[in-house]
């Protein structure tokens, strides 16, 4: 098993591995090109994103600056929006569903380091995958830690630090992030009424 295979499977691996470094630098070059042209040449920026990401649906919008490690381990669905300063450390797979919105400075970290300093000082790292369901809104300055799953239809309050997985259909917030309540029919009625009033 090579270092890339170890990395993607969640085993300890050497991030300094030459093949991984080549992939990392290639991704950084694409990220730099994307950030430079995102507002001046949308077609070129979209093409760069298609080359950078592992897969991407339709209607993808990422505000620069954007940062990631490899890009190829990031899969996003349709109608994805990420605001400024999004950071995705994708040493493992990051699966993002459709109709997902990320506020400014949202960080998704699959990367982790050993607690034992002797192992850590050898340059060994590991990762855990992250998944985000459909119709999720993650507020600004949220940190999603390695191995987290966020269920579909969830709303995450700004400034949250997610250390445990979040179920679907809830509002969650805090440091550490905790479920505050379920999203219910009253929420739907309220926001549909707001939408109706807007059209008057």
Residue ranges and their predicted role:
Residues 54-57, 133, 149, 167:
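Short conserved AdoMet
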Residues 139-165:
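Beta-rich strand-turn-strand
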Residues 137, 155, 171-173:
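Short-chain dehydrogenase/reductase
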Residues 39, 66-76, 81-149, 175-176, ...:
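Flexible, glycine/small-residue-enriched loop-and-beta-strand segment within the central core
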Residues 161-182:
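A contiguous, mid-protein "functional segment" used to position or interact
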Residues 1-59, 177-200:
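Terminal amphipathic alpha-helical/low-complexity segments used for targeting or macromolecular assembly
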Residues 4-5, 52, 98, 122, ...:
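Short secondary-structure boundary/capping segments
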């Amino acid at each position: 098993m090579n270092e890339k295979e170890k990395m993607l499977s969640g085993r300890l691996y050497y991030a300094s591995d030459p093949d991984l470094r080549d992939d990392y630098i290639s991704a950084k070059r694409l990220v730099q090109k994307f950030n430079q042209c995102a507002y001046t040449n949308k077609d070129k920026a979209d093409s760069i994103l298609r080359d950078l990401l592992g897969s991407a649906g339709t209607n993808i919008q990422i505000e620069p600056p954007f940062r990631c490690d490899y890009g190829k381990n990031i899969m996003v669905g349709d109608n994805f929006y990420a605001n400024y300063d999004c950071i995705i450390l994708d040493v493992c797979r990051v699966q993002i569903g459709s109709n997902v919105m990320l506020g400014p400075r949202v960080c998704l970290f699959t990367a982790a380091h050993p607690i034992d300093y002797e192992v850590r000082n050898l340059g060994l790292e590991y990762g855990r995958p992250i998944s985000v369901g459909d119709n999720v809104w993650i507020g600004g300055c949220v940190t999603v830690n390695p191995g987290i799953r966020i269920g579909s239809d969830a709303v995450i309050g700004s400034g949250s630090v997610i250390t445990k997985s979040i179920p679907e259909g809830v509002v969650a917030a805090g440091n550490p992030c905790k479920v505050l309540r379920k999203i219910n029919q009253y929420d739907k009625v309220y926001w549909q009424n707001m939408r109706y009033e807007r059209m008057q």
